């Protein structure tokens, strides 16, 4: 991590796996973490990742609404607030920043390599993999599966409703990730399940 940061700032839905991972990484780096979250249809009950943010010591602001595409606006407001307080935040747009989505997708492709080793140890190959994913997770799984030449069908189950064409965004993340990894692969939205 380059830069003179003293905290991270990111946001998504209240049950975001990405936010949970970001908070855990910040803790490992001895950085404070700030989250801007929307409950949406998930409700306000302290459970799952929303509970883990609390256990991990994240500073959480919950904004009202159900349109997650409004999160970047709220992140910018929180960023300015932290700057005024003298903090030095690393702003991570996560699923809302095009470069962030590609890097996160690549991290999930790397996780697929770990799964590949485990399956080989068990002399097993999955024919289907179901992932709860908004965009980055599924993109990384799709990318990793193709790089590893798996016959596996990746089936995404999105916990989030998006106005944008999410299959096109997943294909974009796959294509940009493949390019960064020098993998000669091409994805279309028709390939995404």
Model-identified regions with their sequence ranges:
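A short, small-residue-rich loop immediately preceding and capping a beta-strand
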Residues: 3-22, 29-38, 125-134
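Active-site-proximal loop->helix
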Residues: 20-65, 164-176
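Hydrophobic beta-strand scaffold residues
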Residues: 33, 60, 89, 152-154
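Small/polar-residue-rich loop-to-helix segments that shape phosphate-bearing ligand pockets
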Residues: 40-121, 184-193
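Glycine-rich beta-alpha junction loops
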Residues: 96-97, 133-136, 158-164
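Conserved mixed alpha/beta catalytic, RNA-binding, or beta-rich assembly cores of soluble enzyme
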Residues: 143-147, 159-160
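Active-site/ligand-binding loops adjacent to catalytic centers
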Residues: 152-193
């Amino acid at each position: 991590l380059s830069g003179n940061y003293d905290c991270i700032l990111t946001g998504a839905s209240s049950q975001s796996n990405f936010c949970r991972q970001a908070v855990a990484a910040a803790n490992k780096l001895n950085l404070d973490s700030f989250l801007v979250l929307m409950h949406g249809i998930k409700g306000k009950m302290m459970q799952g990742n929303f509970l883990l943010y609390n256990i991990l010591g994240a500073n959480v602001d919950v904004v009202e609404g159900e349109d997650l595409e409004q999160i970047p606006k709220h992140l910018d407001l929180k960023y300015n607030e932290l700057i005024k307080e003298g903090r030095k935040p690393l702003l991570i747009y996560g699923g809302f920043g095009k470069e962030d989505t590609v890097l996160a997708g690549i991290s999930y492709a790397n996780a697929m390599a770990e799964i590949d080793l485990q399956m080989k140890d068990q002399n097993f190959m999955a024919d289907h993999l179901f992932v709860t994913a908004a965009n980055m997770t599924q993109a990384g799984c799709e990318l990793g599966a193709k790089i590893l030449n798996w016959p596996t069908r990746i089936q995404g189950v999105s916990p989030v409703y998006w106005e944008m064409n999410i299959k096109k965004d997943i294909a974009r993340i796959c294509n940009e990730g493949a390019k960064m990894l020098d993998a000669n692969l091409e994805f279309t939205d028709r390939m995404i399940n």
